[in-house]
């Protein structure tokens, strides 16, 4: 059995459930910075406790997911971890432009991580 750690990275500063799209008027960059560091630390901890993979995904204009770019999150995790597989659970291909660009980015990430990238795709 393999164990994957995953975190949606929600925006915690909402008082009630909100509909999509979530307005960026309520986004505070200082709180955002703190949340990203905290959430990345939680994902980094997955390696320390023995998980096989850590997963990141893509959500836009949503209070329940602060990850519009899973490739950027994977890049940060490459630098913060040593051996754990980094699962990119979905680049939304229609939003990414040309598929060659996505393939090249994933190839770069896999090379920089010494083969630790596992990637999937979603339709949107």
What residue spans do the PLM features occupy?
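Hydrophobic or amphipathic alpha-helical targeting/insertion segments
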Residues: 112-114
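Conserved beta-strand positions in the central sheet of alpha/beta enzyme cores
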Residues: 55, 118-120
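A short, small-residue-rich loop immediately preceding and capping a beta-strand
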Residues: 84-90, 118
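Glycine-rich anion/phosphate-binding loops
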Residues: 33-38, 94-108
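Glycine-rich "substrate-gating" loop/helix at the edge of Rossmann-like oxidoreductase active sites
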Residues: 63-66, 91-97
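Active-site beta-loop-alpha junctions enriched in small/polar residues
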Residues: 8-10, 59, 91-93, 122-124
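N-terminal beta1-alpha1-beta2 module of alpha/beta enzyme domains
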Residues: 1-81, 85-86
